[in-house]
């Protein structure tokens, strides 16, 4: 099965997302998918809170005249803005945009709050819905008209040095987040022609999907003083002088959820990282005539024991065990524990790992400790697999001074190996003309094993 078919199929079968809503590019998070989203963004919120970011919530509606202040930035998506033009039947004097992003709303308010250097740094974030009138082919959780999970952080600083340090913190924070949800990535400095409009520069996280295409899953932008000058974000320095603040912004969206689903899935279904799994352990009673009560009493006891540390479900549906195995493999539940009369007689239980399919017999008397060990191994294995997956999709090609020869070499590597092609960095081919020659996207300048490369790939 092709990846795109698998992806659409698994969103439905695993109860992740329903795209049958009657607006293109808008869908519904189903309960199981929403829990994956919730646990994932809890990790992200924790990382932000621990680094002194404050969560807030700004309005969704933006007056047209305020949005227009973004100038160069708004040109990047002015054709994608949704507009509210009426209040009931009454035309509005000023059109209102549905939030495509929040620079204008946040920076308008920051101007009210930032007066002196002691008000800095200011580090705010929110998790909100944003709207883009995507005209390209929409894809669930990947390319949406209503992005339902947009985490955007915006910071303001007194000095360029503090601003640069914030970029480093944001990159480390995002790296830790993607490591936690077992999504592999490379980090690139986007080329000038592909940076965030209005930014000094953009750093981006890209992951690789099973079909060899890359997906941008996070961005970090150094805005310098560009937006501050537009929005008159001035403050009084310790010397009593006036200066503009230095700013950063960085975002992660539903693509993080799409990626943790896509990267580790297999022909059986999802393989979910433990920390974001809605159900971490499923218990399956193996019932035999005359032994039902013994088995159910024991497995209910096990349920109570494990629930002290894990999210556990006891599947007591009146269907065959094989059907239950299939259902929970599709949903990617990390561990399955089976318990039948013979297991009880022997003082044992059978644990099955979703990531490897390995079946492990453990002593029932020590089951909590055994489960903790296996969960730890599961987590480590998924992280190792994540690293392997992206390394297997990286290909380094030798540099050629002849641009046409180099482009043919890159195209051949993309055709043969797919994934990300790394070219030793050289300014002579770091341009849009070369991007057109190779019929792929230049991700940017990437450091790999201590060397600088131009990274190129076919992208979503």
UniProtKB/Swiss-Prot annotation:
What the entry lists under Gene3D superfamilies is as follows: Anticodon-binding domain, Bira Bifunctional Protein, Domain 2, C-terminal domain of ProRS
Cite the entry's keywords alphabetically: Aminoacyl-tRNA synthetase, ATP-binding, Cytoplasm, Ligase, Nucleotide-binding, Protein biosynthesis
User: Catalysed reaction(s)?
Assistant: tRNA(Pro) + L-proline + ATP = L-prolyl-tRNA(Pro) + AMP + diphosphate
Q: Which cysteines are joined by disulfide bonds?
A: none
Biological process terms from the Gene Ontology for this record are: prolyl-tRNA aminoacylation
Q: Does the keyword Transmembrane helix apply?
A: no
Localization (cell) = Cytoplasm
What are the GO cellular component annotations? Answer: aminoacyl-tRNA synthetase multienzyme complex; cytoplasm
Q: Which InterPro entries match?
A: aa-tRNA-synt_IIb, aa-tRNA-synth_II, aa-tRNA-synth_II/BPL/LPL, Anticodon-bd, Anticodon-bd_dom_sf, Pro-tRNA-ligase_IIa, Pro-tRNA-ligase_IIa_arc-type, Pro-tRNA_synth_II
A single GO molecular function term of this UniProt record: ATP binding
| CDD domains for the chain | ProRS_core_arch_euk
State which Enzyme Commission number(s) the record gives: 6.1.1.15
Q: Which domain of life is it from?
A: Archaea
What does it do?
Answer: Catalyzes the attachment of proline to tRNA(Pro) in a two-step reaction: proline is first activated by ATP to form Pro-AMP and then transferred to the acceptor end of tRNA(Pro).
According to the record's subunit comment, the protein's assembly and interactions are:
Homodimer.
Family, according to the entry, reads as follows: Belongs to the class-II aminoacyl-tRNA synthetase family. ProS type 3 subfamily.
PANTHER family associated with the record: BIFUNCTIONAL GLUTAMATE_PROLINE--TRNA LIGASE, PROLYL-TRNA SYNTHETASE
What is stated about domains?
Answer: Consists of three domains: the N-terminal catalytic domain, the anticodon-binding domain and the C-terminal extension.
Please give the name of this protein. Proline--tRNA ligase
**Species of the source:** Methanococcus maripaludis (strain C6 / ATCC BAA-1332)
Q: What is the lineage of its organism?
A: Archaea, Methanobacteriati, Methanobacteriota, Methanomada group, Methanococci
Q: Gene encoding it?
A: proS
